[in-house]
Amino acid sequence: MIKKIWFLVCVFVCGVANATVDTSLVERAEKYLNSITGLVGGFVQTANGRDERGDFAMLRPGRVRLDYANMPIQLISDGDDLYFFDKSLDQITTVPLTSTPAGILVRKNIDLHNADINVVETVDGNNSFSLKMNLKGQEGLGYMTVVFDKKPVKLNSWSVDDATGAKTDVVFNNLKTKTNFGRDYFQIQRHKTISTSGGDDFYD
């Protein structure tokens, strides 16, 4: 499961041929995402038929935190990098936030027509709609689909598919707005010293 979590962190792209894109749905998603400052709630992650639950928080620009209930794992972004923290080993692995699914959702200005983002497919359902996305420069590794409830528009879930067809779903629940977090909430607390503060053009 930890391997699947790491895949969820890293993979975010793939082309989809002959798909249709409804620009009005893209604009609705973009408007909603730009209206969010902070969220907290729960999540259920499903991979290989196994569920893992935990707590989710985000604060734009650039901050994300996922705490897994039954594993010693945290994912925390400080606005620059995303840290995969294995508490049992007191070990941190770092990737640029811009290369992850979460990075799209917490940019300072979310522009889904940005040169580095491709919305390759939209699906309009009765109660929800979804956007399938990829990032340029990482084609062939997988793709991400973000699902939004319609009435009112709000984040429902995201899923990541790799090139082999393996899928990881993250469904959010009980999401509420929140902007007042503790000063160190989006920083890792560990035995060894590491700087977890920074930023870049997307998140400053």
Regions found by a protein language model. Give the residues of each.
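Positively charged n-region of N-terminal signal peptides that target proteins for export
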Residues: 1-4
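N-terminal signal peptide c-region/cleavage motif recognized by signal peptidases
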Residues: 14-16
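Cleaved targeting-peptide boundary
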Residues: 19-27
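A short, Trp-centered hydrophobic/proline-enriched beta-strand micro-motif
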Residues: 31-49
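Extracytoplasmic
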Residues: 36-38, 51-53, 59-61, 70, ...
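Soluble periplasmic/extracytoplasmic beta-strand elements of cell-envelope proteins
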Residues: 40-42, 57, 65, 83-84, ...
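An acidic-aromatic
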Residues: 55-104, 168
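Gly/Pro-enriched, hydrophobic low-complexity segments
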Residues: 113-122, 126-198
